[in-house]
Amino acid sequence: MKTRVFISKNASDCESLVHFCIQNSIELIAQSLIEFEAVPFEIESNYDIAFFSSIRSGQFFFKNELQKSNVVYACIGQTTHSKLKKLGIECEFVGEEAGNPQKIAAEFKSWVKNRTVIFPQSNLSLRTFSSILPENQVINKIVYKTNLIERKIENCQIYIFTSPSNLDAFLTINKIPYDAKVIVWGKSTENRLLKKGIIADFVLAKSNFAELIEVLKSIN
């Protein structure tokens, strides 16, 4: 029987995975279960650092805010940094293990010292990074809204959840078969899964497609 894999990303966002599945005769259902919309915002205070937890936070932030020469930019990991570079944004702090935000947050706190940080974010942000800093150093700014999409997904042998929000959207009208393998994109998604009473079979530390493909090879 042909293996069927679900990932909560659109095919256009995971070309290397699509190619791997074609090569290995794997049926891939690539479907993001969330969508985004801009939220109007104003920034009343000065800041020294802007931290981006995803490319979306950067995209929506720079729709309203100009890049500033006196501001330092930082982000959660290499994938986000690569996409920010396409917007002309170079980051001085880039997390090494995007799948382990708690670890990166501790490193980020040491790097920030006493500077003020703005955190462009979604309305559903977990605020992992801003919560570890003193309140007087933090500007939490909602710049976009995350909307969950209810969509029925065919039963699969392998499920790959790329964010807590995608997991929540999936579970609104779907169930994970008891014998399916579950791969999650980092600790935050793993923790959300645990709250639902489900244990992940694999947790991606770096949360990138090279790591994911190696895991899929080990399963098959």
Regions found by a protein language model. Give the residues of each.
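Signature of uroporphyrinogen-III synthase
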Residues: M1-N220
